[in-house]
Design a protein with these regions (language model features):
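Glycine- and acidic
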Residues: 95-103, 118-136, 171-181, 213-222, ...
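Secondary-structure capping and boundary motifs in well-ordered enzyme cores
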Residues: 1-2, 37, 41, 107-111, ...
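Signature of N6-adenine DNA methyltransferases within the class I
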Residues: 18-42, 47, 54, 136-137, ...
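S-adenosyl-L-methionine-dependent nucleic acid methyltransferase catalytic domains
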Residues: 12, 163, 169-171, 193-310, ...
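Preference for the N-terminal adenyl/adenosyl cofactor-binding alpha/beta module
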Residues: 1-189, 193-195, 218, 222-231, ...
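Flexible, glycine/threonine-enriched loop-and-boundary segments that flank and lead into catalytic domains
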Residues: 124, 158-175, 262, 275-311, ...
Length: 624
């Protein structure tokens, strides 16, 4: 069905955009050569698709009915082989004709990514970690990675034949590689931008015509989903046709689109299990001379065998560690397994692409840039990720600091992202930090995306000095909510049974502290349990806690079913404490902390520092 959809999209686009010489060739074929009830539409489409795989003059074409024989030879593998075509009713036949009556000529190939994402079920999209990338976000990656430099080179080459020739030759020797290409959005945008730069230079030096040198065969990708893989290949073909039309409009030279050239550089597979160099080789010419050239490209007598420039980019799947399958965790572990850092199991899935990208460009002039979650630039993920990168003598060339992910797709990703560019370490090269509409030139960028050297703050469970009291995880009830009281419930219980107040304490976590929400909890010591059970409301709640824990899947929770009056994890001390929320807004310059009295239990949604003197609070809230 995936191949069928790709073939349909191509035919609709081809009949409206001039790929097929006859306008409405495909739609008219459906209207005139098939029964109105749709009974023979399947067979007729199979015949038409087969014809588009037959070269001109082949014996098989002679036996084709006239209605189907008008279809040209397409090639490229799009119509190669028999693939399932669904059966049609009169209603579905009409829907197909209605689709053909739309004008597909000016369709933006970028929207196929949006369309693909809308077709994927939300649960599958979550499993794959797929997020469609809009053109503005794509340009945040491509411009600092290579486009800005190519634009500067194009400006220097305009009107100067020798420079222009060298520039065009350079363009033909670049490889562009997206190892998580999805439906091809990054590759399509990159292809269009590079072709337009080429046109600008050729316009200024007509002697270098007749034909362009940049080809879709310079664009490489890996995609794990078969439908997205088909759409990526199709979109590149359509994008090439659009740019050929633009080439004709600007330079008056017509470049034939058909027959399509095979494009086997978009590989179907798992990028974390494939050898990237087998997909995008580092050696040999990036492409042979284009099929349409009448003479060797730019008068060259032999193909260029220089080592190509390679740029790797993309928006890999995010998937936090808790969302990953066992197989996905193993894939990340295989990449970072030799790291001296702990907590490899907590790495986001996107870290796999960062690691393999660093491995690919190590010791070479190649560069890479990826959209990633901002998690890899903060907290415990920094150690294992950046240990691997820095050991390969790689540095950050540019970075976009945290921004909310937005696009035009139906399903928004709902994450905060960064963009990170990597290159071989240079002594005198400058780096750039982008923040909203501002850009700052710096000597070096730290793994926290601030100006500075590659220093990593290591995870530790112990204070840096014995003078600091320990910070501990808050107390976790695992009670099904039965040991916790809202402010209203607290007053109801206390008003009914005054003696219950001796078993109740204030209960505060991140939300309670930041928002000022008032909650309470039952906090009962073992020696108090017999007295506490005399109170009906407490006895009722303890029975519910016991039942909840017995039914738990966690052995550690079930072990406390016979002690329902206790929190399963207890850190509380009857002293004043500092509360440090585990989660707060990223827009805050400081983590909101505060002092709590000895009668407040800090929950597991926050951290606690007990017996802390005022100077400890001062250091914790300092930006030093």
């Amino acid at each position: 069905m995936n191949v069928f959809m790709a073939r349909l999209l191509f035919c609709f686009f081809a009949e409206d955009s001039g790929i097929f010489e006859e306008e409405r060739l495909f739609t008219d074929f459906i209207e005139r050569a098939t029964a109105s009830d749709g009974s023979d539409l399947r067979e007729q489409l199979e015949r038409a698709f087969a014809v588009m795989n037959l070269p001109p003059g082949s014996p098989e074409r002679a036996a084709v009915p006239i209605s189907a024989a008008r279809f040209p030879y397409v090639n490229g593998g799009l119509f190669q082989g028999a693939h399932a075509v669904p059966r049609f009713s009169s209603r579905s036949r009409k829907a197909l004709i209605d689709a053909g009556n739309l004008d597909w000529s000016d369709i933006n190939t970028d929207i196929f990514g949006n369309m693909f994402q809308a077709c994927v079920a939300p649960d599958k999209r979550s499993c794959l970690g797929e997020h469609y990338t809009s053109v503005p976000n794509i340009m945040k990656v491509l411009r600092p990675l290579f486009l800005e430099e190519l634009e500067n080179a194009a400006r220097q080459a305009r009107g100067h034949e020798a420079r222009a020739r060298k520039f065009i030759e350079r363009l033909s020797n670049i490889r562009f590689f997206d190892p998580a290409c999805g439906s091809g959005n990054f590759l399509i945008v990159a292809f269009k931008e590079v072709r337009r730069l080429e046109m600008e230079v050729l316009e200024s030096v007509p002697a270098l015509l007749p034909m362009p040198s940049v080809s879709i065969n310079q664009f490489y990708g890996i995609e794990i989903d078969d439908f997205a893989h088909e759409i990526a290949m199709l979109s590149l073909w359509l994008a090439e046709h659009q740019m050929n039309q633009e080439f004709f409009e600007r330079l008056g030279k017509r470049v034939p689109t058909l027959p399509l050239r095979p494009n086997d550089h978009i590989v179907l597979g798992n990028a974390l299990r494939l050898d990237w160099e087998t997909v995008c080789p580092k050696t040999a010419p990036a492409q042979a001379a284009p099929l349409w050239t009448v003479e060797p490209l730019l008068q060259r007598a032999a193909p260029d065998v220089r080592e190509p420039e390679i740029y790797i980019f993309g928006n890999p799947p995010y998937l936090g560690s808790k969302m990953q399958s066992v197989a996905q965790k193993e894939e990340v572990k295989n990449i970072y397994g030799n790291s001296n850092s702990e907590n490899i199991s907590n790495l986001d899935y996107v870290c796999g692409w960062i690691g393999l990208g660093a491995e690919f460009i190590a010791g070479s002039p190649y560069q890479c840039a990826f959209v990633t979650t901002n998690s890899i630039t903060q907290g415990e993920q920094v150690g294992p990720v950046w240990d691997l990168i820095f050991k390969k003598n790689i540095e950050i060339s540019f970075a976009y600091t945290s921004f909310k992910w937005t696009n035009n797709a139906k399903y928004q990703a709902g994450v905060t992202c960064v963009i990170i560019g990597l290159r071989r370490k240079h002594v005198n090269s400058k780096s750039f930090i982008y923040n909203e509409n501002k850009v700052k030139e710096v000597d070096k960028i730290s793994p926290y995306l601030i100006p500075g050297s590659p220093v990593i703050v290591r995870r530790t469970k112990k204070p840096v000095t014995k003078k600091f009291p320990p910070m501990v995880f808050g107390s976790m009830p695992r009670d099904g909510g039965h040991l916790i009281l809202t402010e209203e419930e607290y007053h109801e219980v206390v008003n009914k049974e005054q003696e219950s107040i001796s078993f109740i304490k204030r209960f505060s976590g991140s939300q309670e502290f930041i928002r000022g929400t008032i909650r309470y909890c039952f906090w009962i010591a073992p020696e108090q349990i017999s007295q506490a059970r005399k109170i009906f409301e407490i006895r009722k709640r303890l029975d519910l806690v016991s039942k909840e824990r017995k039914e738990s899947k966690a052995p550690s929770t079930r072990a406390y079913a016979d002690r329902p009056y206790l929190f399963v994890q207890r850190a509380y001390k009857p002293t004043d404490s500092i509360i440090i929320p585990a989660v707060s807004s990223e827009r805050r310059e400081y983590i909101p902390m505060g002092y709590l009295d000895k009668d407040t239990v800090i929950s597991n949604s926050a951290f606690a520092v007990y017996d802390a003197e005022p100077w400890v609070f001062g250091i914790l809230t300092s930006r030093m």
